[in-house]
Swiss-Prot record:
Pfam families per the UniProt record, alphabetical: DUF444
Name of the protein described by the UniProt record: UPF0229 protein PFL_5654
Source species: Pseudomonas fluorescens (strain ATCC BAA-477 / NRRL B-23932 / Pf-5)
Segments for region (Disordered): 85-108
Entry similarity comment: Belongs to the UPF0229 family.
Amino acid composition bias (Gly residues), ranges on this chain: 92-108
Organism superkingdom: Bacteria
Length: 424
């Protein structure tokens, strides 16, 4: 008996369907493991997947068996060691689910946990599951949809510029074999017979001439089969796929004042790294505006936003004023979905907190889809938090605020802020 052993590592993705079915079946286990991994890892450590363990008892297939009801008459052998109601001790060592600790035993059976690895893409999929930018709507629609061109297979008709040379030559080769296959076989036999006659019967001129004529006739028939026919032409088929024309921008406002300790700044940076990762993975096209502020605010690039060491006093309104100016200049609200995320320790110049409230209520909140504020402090809230609470009362659907105490709070708070909401 012959055996064919496929040693390819998931060649041609042939077991992808089975893997996706497995991931759906044990989604709860995987999601719990991902949440634990996020709280354990650094937010920047997302370049690889995660090892998932599933208890052996949870991967058992359901079986049909006889119930415990009914009346049975059974004779059991007696024993001198156990009586009714006693519990049998758990075997030492090799029992299933053991963590590798304890002494070895000479008895006991069980099943270890099932351990497998999920990829980075699968890890991020579970990490950002059920998250979205709230209130994302289409902007600047004038009755025409936008489209993107995507590959949709092979067609027998199309633009010469889109001809698929490999598929065309393959089709032509198959056609030539089909049309001239029998003639080639006869030609091969005729040549072999001619060679035999010339070798064994060189004086048999009649048969030799007849075979030479047959060979010439078969060769002419084969050459009449065209190398390329219009039937062989294959073209790459491109179709237009509707593309939602939503345009979105996210403003990231980070406090880098002197009151922000290095630990507090690190938590703020981790929050924005998680937000940036979420945006770039879930949305193809979205603008991100980075603003750092102390007594003054500046728009910076991604590198400077996360790694600059500049610091100073605290005037939060400077960042809000700059955001409003950029909105008015580059992101009109009738064309753009505008979002903002602000992180601070809540320490602000007292006279500035009411100014922040007025700017938000009158110049920013009426034009944004969603505004989030996270306050990173283990202490009691200060004036800025209470001013923002008044904003949350006025804009309950589009304003949210949360408190962060430690790095372990980042992911739960992030999920709370961007949890997918039911559309009513």
């Amino acid at each position: 008996m012959s055996y064919v052993i496929d040693r390819r590592l998931n060649g041609k993705n042939k077991s992808t369907v089975n893997r996706q079915r497995f991931l759906r079946r044990y989604r709860d286990h995987i999601k719990k493991a991902v949440e634990e991994a996020v709280s354990r890892r650094s937010i920047t450590d997302m370049e690889h997947g995660e090892q998932i363990s599933i208890p052996g008892r949870d991967i058992d297939e359901p079986v049909l068996h006889h119930g415990r009801g009914g009346k049975q008459t059974v004779v059991h052998p007696g024993n001198k060691e156990f009586t009714a109601g006693e519990h049998i001790a758990r075997p030492q060592g090799g029992g299933g689910g053991g963590g590798g600790r304890g002494k070895a035993g000479n008895s006991g059976e069980g099943m270890d946990e099932f351990v497998f690895q999920i990829t980075q893409e699968e890890f991020l999929e579970f990490m950002f599951e059920d998250l979205e930018l709230p209130n994302l709507v289409k902007r600047n629609l004038t009755g025409t949809d936008t489209f993107k061109t995507v590959r949709a297979g092979i067609s027998n008709e199309g633009n010469p510029a889109r001809i698929n040379i490999i598929r065309t030559l393959r089709s032509a080769h198959a056609r030539r074999i089909a049309l001239s296959g029998s003639s080639r076989a006869k030609l091969r036999e005729a040549k072999e017979e001619l060679a035999r006659l010339k070798r064994e019967e060189p004086d048999n001129f009649g048969d030799i001439q007849e075979l030479e004529a047959e060979i010439e006739r078969l060769s002419a028939r084969i050459h009449r089969v065209p190398f390329l026919d219009t039937f062989d032409l294959k073209y790459n088929l491109l179709v237009k796929q509707p593309n939602p024309s939503s345009k979105a921008v996210m403003f990231c406002l980070m406090d880098v004042s002197g009151s922000m300790t290095q630990a507090t700044k690190d938590i703020a940076k981790r929050f924005f790294i998680l937000l940036y990762l979420f945006l770039k993975r879930n949305y193809d096209k979205i603008d991100v505006v980075f603003i750092r502020h102390h007594t003054s605010a500046r728009e910076v690039d991604e590198e400077e936003f996360f790694y600059s060491r500049e610091t100073g006093g605290t005037i939060v309104s400077s960042a809000l004023k700059l955001m409003q100016e950029i909105m008015a200049e580059r992101y009109p609200s009738n064309e753009w979905n505008i979002y903002a995320a602000q992180a601070s320790d809540g320490d602000n110049w007292n006279d500035d907190s009411p100014i922040c409230r007025d700017i938000l209520i009158n110049q920013i909140m009426p034009f944004v889809q969603y505004y989030t504020y996270v306050e990173i402090t283990p202490r009691e809230h200060q004036a800025l938090w209470f001013e923002y609470e008044r904003i949350a009362e006025a804009f309950s659907d589009t304003f949210a605020q949360q408190q962060l105490v430690s790095a372990g709070d980042i992911y739960p708070v992030f999920r709370e802020l961007f949890q997918r909401r039911l559309v009513t």
